[in-house]
């Protein structure tokens, strides 16, 4: 009789667990997009990221740990840190294993700084293999560094697109040059079929159904001079003005930090912000607890921010997506 009671007790506990899990699954958020940062931008909500220019520990364990990170997206630096695609792939696998996020997304968004300078179209095309290998790991976006020339930006957009996507081809773009054979590994990270991945792996908002965010670093005097033309290229979602490198390029090294900036730096920021607004491109700038509300009011929609700053920003804009 005692054994029967134990069996019934175990069965009852198991049923309760199943019911609890079913209720939790039913109540879990149901994201509209794979890319959390993109979904927030679509909602008109600012996006906050974390990451170091010294690089991210590219390992499965670190990815699993970062799956529940406070930030909306992770900036994975390969511009100044080693270009190690295998480590990035392991990190993405860890993120998927540690998910879903509190917002219901399979992973946080990951955007990679790839070590390709947008000097000209030929340079970008010669190094497009880097974009292809990075995208095959399942990341959600790429930043083109030192995006100096509109031809380079155009080549960048074409390099990351599959040729099946035709939006913008009638507006100066050529068809995409990305090959299909990296789709299978990326699809596993996104949790979709290869066909679904190919349909979704495109530049948003150029393609309203796309899930990739393409950004520009307009971070030197050459990019500054061409900012308006660079941002007219279809397919770019966001841009930053890179105050650290910009200050070096403009001859005022160290002026990109906190505090009052020289007039030449203020003018550079204002020009790039205005060009972003004119071309409906989201503007990226760093934020801290003291200035985050003013930055948002000024039009900043993405940026690195501490957990304290993100709490202030999210409450100020009345974000509804769980975090």
Language-model segments: residues:
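Expand to "…catalyze enediolate/carbanion chemistry for C-C bond making/breaking, isomerization
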Residues: 25-323
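Bacterial N-terminal signal peptides
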Residues: 10-22
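N-terminal secretory signal peptides that target proteins for export/translocation
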Residues: 1-7
